[in-house]
Amino acid sequence: MRFNDITRGSGLEQHGITNPNLIYWTSPTSVLYEQVVRRGEGLISHLGALTVKTGHYTGRAANDKFIVDEPESSSRINWGKVNRPFPPESFDHLYKKMTSYMQGRDLFVQDCFAGASPEHRIPVRIITERAWHALFARNMFLRATQEELLTHNTEFTVIDLPAFHAQPKVDGTNSEAFIIINFARKLVIIGGTSYAGEIKKSIFTVLNYLLPQKGVMSMHCSANAGEKGEVAIFFGLSGTGKTTLSAAPNRLLIGDDEHGWDDAGVFNFEGGCYAKVINLSPQSEPEIYQCTRKFGTILENVAIDTISRRIDLDDASFTENTRASYPITHIPNIVGEGCGGHPNHVIMLTCDAFGVLPPIARLTPAQAMYHFLSGYTAKVAGTEAGVTEPQATFSACFGAPFMALRPSLYADLLGKKIASHKVSCWLVNTGWSGGGPGIGGRMKIAYSRALVNAALDGTLGAGSFVKDSVFGLDIPSACPGLPADILNPRNVWSDKSAYDATAHKLVEMFRHNFEQFKATTSPEIASVL
């Protein structure tokens, strides 16, 4: 059998899969395009990107993710609302049903790698019933060469069957959708959802379990490098600007979402990007915008005119969470090998919808650990006209849904690396200024870029700072090219007493959330706020 072949028979017996119909082995992009169109899975847009719809699930099914509770990993897992236990016998029963379902069906297999570091990468296999999910895997993971395929010894397998629905009362799931990780069997099973992000995030969870046990810091962050190789990493939850701010014309992109930090430096886990594209414009985000016009890109839930085949990135009729999946090589300025040195700067991004955090602030190491464990951002509660009450969101390590181990373990690793390499740390608010929604305005992307650039090139560090009286943050007195009054958030509010009340309210939210970490952190970190 040649790689990229279409074969009858199995070759998948090691996974318990017998009697499938056609198997598309590591098919190239063009073949997968043909299969997507032939099977009615999507449409080709006028400039070549593939448009698909995910149906009911347009985002992650957070309540439907489980980890099998088995002896090998049970004591290490941070069990709770995020990492829900699933009985081994229920997993075996459900998996047997899935293997029966696959009999007589066409399957798409992609053999690839997770992790750009030769020392830490793991060979992964994605088996799916959807051609476009195979293309997603091909975009998002690191592609194996023909020579590497000869020795590709799969360490973790994802079996993805969107049309296979669980029976909650029988199978022990919360709904018809499920994402279940079994560390003992090195297997992930996904069913009942077509949202492709589940594939990449399940392997991200696997890496977040495996690598820290080897002393490698795993991170939900983007990363880029300057002309001289100086590296910056950007932590942040979805919608805070990781992808946007790391795809900068004056820097080389290492990766946009998932990275490791070992003794040699930073390395990308992926071979592609998964960018939010709602209201994307060529002016504010030119690099990402151009990717939505390229062959090989998958546009998830983006509106398309079925006659002209033109897309509308401003149309949120399907979801606000429209996405583009594309190989990182679609970006013109990248670090080709996906690896960089030790970071010079750590930037923690937040989208503060209360409008009380500064656009940028310098953090002490203790403050950096506090904000890393807090993982704060805020979302607008509703879409009604007028003022809406923001909702604070705290997600430990800026990625709690994907962190299988205890947050303190990740924080300890990060703290040691920051101290060892004397890393400068910054907090950047890409959210509101002058008040929340309906009162203030969203921070301009151009302002955030200018502030980040000034931090990375040393301009801010060489200047003076003023101490914020509420959050204890060091705020720069000036930034070239920006109005000085926007740097201190209190100055932008017309009602200063309203600012004070809102800021202190947010401080109390921080304190309440941090109670869970006090027992495992130093007094210096616990007393930051």
UniProtKB/Swiss-Prot annotation:
Keywords of this entry: ATP-binding, Cytoplasm, Decarboxylase, Gluconeogenesis, Lyase, Manganese, Metal-binding, Nucleotide-binding
Cellular location(s): Cytoplasm
GO biological process: gluconeogenesis
Matches recorded under Pfam families: PEPCK_ATP
EC number: 4.1.1.49
Pathway: Carbohydrate biosynthesis; gluconeogenesis
Cofactor(s) required, per the database record: Mn(2+)
GO-annotated molecular function: ATP binding; metal ion binding; phosphoenolpyruvate carboxykinase (ATP) activity
Catalytic activity: oxaloacetate + ATP = phosphoenolpyruvate + ADP + CO2
Known role: Involved in the gluconeogenesis. Catalyzes the conversion of oxaloacetate (OAA) to phosphoenolpyruvate (PEP) through direct phosphoryl transfer between the nucleoside triphosphate and OAA.
Entry protein name: Phosphoenolpyruvate carboxykinase (ATP)
UniProt gene name: pckA
